[in-house]
Amino acid sequence: MIIKNIFILILFFCYSFSQDYLWPVQASKEITAVFGEERPGRYHTGIDVRTFGEIGYKLIAIDDGYISRIRTSSKGYGKTIYLKLNDGNTAVYAHLDHFTPELDNLVNALHQHYGKYTIDHKLEPNDHPVTKGDIIGYSGDTGGVSGPHLHFEIRNADGQP
């Protein structure tokens, strides 16, 4: 099982970071859960990056693109950003403490408009473009988690991890 996880992790990094992507968080480069790890009734679809039990580390746009979707929920991924990259892939950042001030204002307005905390809002390419290296949010422990960390995924154009 350990060899399988190591192999999957190597494949993930070879594919994901062969594209000159930046590391997604200004915390550690220590991975606490790998892609494909068995979970009750499913497999882990990304990697979890250690944030030393703390919230508030800067999350970085790994490449140029735009924020295509933002979600908030008290379950699952909690506060989440979907960053559509110019290469067609989508980077997913989950369990955020908060977004950038501009996105926080949008999310607060959506919460008020819909009268509920759970939202799933899609944005257009010109709504919120980002440049590689921009700060897009801050790490946290929202949703169904047991402690602060960044859950990070790269999905292909079909939405598959």
Task: Give the location of each predicted region.
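Histidine-centered catalytic micro-motifs
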Residues: G147-I154
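Sec-dependent N-terminal signal peptides
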Residues: I2-C14
